[in-house]
Every structure is written in C-alpha cells, then in structure tokens.
C-alpha cells in the first residue's frame, strides 16, 4: 500500500519535516547570507525594499529598465557592507528575463529571494472610452505577464536549489475597485497576480514559498501625476488619512523573505492604512 501523500502536491512521507532554522526570532528575521533579486528596484517601492534587505544583511540584485542604477547598487554596497549589482532588463521580454535571472545566479551563486515588483499604473480613464487596446496591452504585459516570466524562471532555479521565497508586489486594487479614478485594467491585472501567487504556492510547495504584498496608496513617483484634489479624496477614504511611505512596506517583505515565515505560503499582506477594511 503506497504511503499517504499530500493531495495537491504529492509530498511524502507525511508529516513533512519542519525546516531547521534558528530558535531565536530576531535571527530568523535576518537575511544575512541570502541573495535577493528585485525587479523595478531603481526607485520607489522597489528601492525601499532593496535597501531594507541590504540593512538586513542580504546581497541584492537591482533590476532596472530605463533608469541606470549602478550608483544605487554601489550605495547599498558601501553603506551596508553587502554585495549589490544592477541589471538592465525589460521584464516584458521573456528571453531577457530568463537570461538576466541566469546571470544573477551565476554572479551571486544562488538566488534565495525574488521580488516581482516592476509595474505601471493605468492612466487612460474609463476602459470603454480608450480608442484602442494599446494601453490595455501595455499594462497587462508589464503588470501580469512580466510577473509571470519572473516567476517561471526564478521558480526553475528554486526547484533546482530546493528552496526559495518568491514575493509578488500585488495591490489593494486586486481586492477592491478604486475610486474616483477608473482603472479596470490595473485592478484586473493585480487580481490575477494575487491568484497566480496562490496557485504557485501550491505548485511549488515541495521546494519554495510564494506570497504577495498588496500596497495601498504610496507616496512614490508613480503617483506624482495625480492631482491634489484626487489625493484629497484618497485621504478621506483611507482610515489612517494619508498615503503610506515606501519604507512602511519593508517589514512585510522582510517577513515573507526571511526564515520567520517558513510556514507562510499563498498569503497576501495588505499594507494600505486600512483602506480595504470599511
């Protein structure tokens, strides 16, 4: 008679073993000795996470597309005594993503943590008023397809290694419909990312974890174009009455990336000032 196994993933024997990690909780939050790869990390949320990871001891691979980030990688190395290097890649190009991930693995020897953070907002207004489908294709290609390419090729490395933590930057927009701005495309893409993560958490259960962080409105350059009267409406809708600072997201990412979360997979952490509560 065959030994019992998990229904979805075929893991056996049961129960599966508990990971051997430090009993000291502060040591479990440390990223010392780990390698983190972060897309869209030349500025905003991505760089805030990259800096937090460096502070926690991780070596960091910074990804950029249009803004060269060698100086930022050098800053992380000199300031925090870690290894950091910048890589140019268009995450909408599957071959570039595959090559970049393989290069990072070669340069650093492994990849412990991957953050799929690159993304763009929808700014075209109500969907049916847009004269063509180019804007839709652009947002979905970056926010969903680009995240998928990263997961596919990072996941292959995680499977080969037998370990890894993958984190998607999703959004509260995957949970609710934003107002007053109309952004059906962005909402749909981020909702898809949430379910992609949960699906991969099951597929990868034997070798890696997969989770999401869902930021609310953050004070970054991605929202610089938003008129003040729109932001005032946001503040009224946010129970805490303000946008978040990117640094306020760092703790969620560090938890999911670290050994403090070895039994956390398929989860989403909302960091939205309470927006989704009412």
UniProtKB/Swiss-Prot annotation:
* Activity's thermal dependence: Optimum temperature is 25-28 degrees Celsius.
Record InterPro entries: NAD(P)-bd_dom_sf, SDR_fam
Q: Which residues bind NADP(+)?
A: 45, 117, 152, 186, 190, 220
The catalytic residues are: 171, 186, 190
Q: What is its EC number?
A: 1.1.1.138
Where does the source fall among the domains of life?
Eukaryota
The alphabetized UniProt keywords are: NADP, Oxidoreductase
Name one molecular function that GO assigns to this entry: mannitol 2-dehydrogenase (NADP+) activity
Top-tier EC class = oxidoreductase
Any Gene Ontology biological process:
mannitol metabolic process
Claim: Oxidoreductase is one of the keywords in the record: yes
Task: Please write the reaction equations for the catalytic activity of this protein.
Answer: D-mannitol + NADP(+) = D-fructose + NADPH + H(+)
CDD domains, from UniProt? MDH-like_SDR_c (cd05352)
Describe the subunit structure.
Homotetramer.
Family named by the database record: Belongs to the short-chain dehydrogenases/reductases (SDR) family.
Name of the protein in question: Probable NADP-dependent mannitol dehydrogenase
Organism equals: Yarrowia lipolytica (strain CLIB 122 / E 150)
């Amino acid at each position: 008679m065959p030994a019992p196994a998990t229904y979805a993933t075929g893991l056996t024997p049961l129960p599966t073993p508990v990971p051997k990690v430090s009993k000291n909780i502060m040591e479990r939050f440390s990223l010392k000795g780990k390698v983190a790869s972060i897309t869209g990390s030349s500025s905003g949320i991505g760089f805030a996470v990259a800096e937090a990871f460096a502070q926690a001891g991780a070596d960091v691979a910074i990804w950029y597309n249009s803004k060269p980030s060698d100086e930022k990688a050098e800053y992380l190395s000199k300031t925090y005594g870690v290894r950091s290097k910048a890589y140019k890649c268009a995450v909408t190009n599957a071959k570039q993503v595959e090559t970049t991930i393989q290069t990072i693995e070669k340069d650093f020897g492994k990849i412990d943590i991957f953050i799929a953070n690159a993304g763009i907002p929808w700014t075209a207004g109500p969907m049916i008023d847009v004269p063509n489908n180019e804007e839709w294709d652009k947002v979905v290609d970056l926010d969903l397809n680009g995240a998928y390419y990263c997961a596919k090729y990072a996941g292959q490395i995680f499977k080969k290694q037998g370990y890894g933590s993958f984190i998607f930057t999703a959004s509260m927009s995957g949970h609710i419909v934003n107002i007053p701005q109309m952004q059906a495309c962005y909402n749909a893409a981020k909702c898809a990312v949430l379910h992609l993560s949960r699906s991969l958490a099951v597929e990868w259960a034997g070798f890696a974890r997969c989770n999401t962080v869902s930021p609310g409105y953050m004070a970054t350059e991605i929202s610089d174009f938003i008129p003040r009267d729109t932001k005032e409406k946001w503040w009224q809708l946010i129970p805490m009455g303000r946008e978040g600072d990117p640094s306020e997201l760092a703790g969620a990412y560090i938890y999911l990336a670290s050994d403090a979360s070895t039994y956390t997979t398929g989860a989403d952490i909302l960091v939205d000032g309470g927006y989704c509560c009412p």
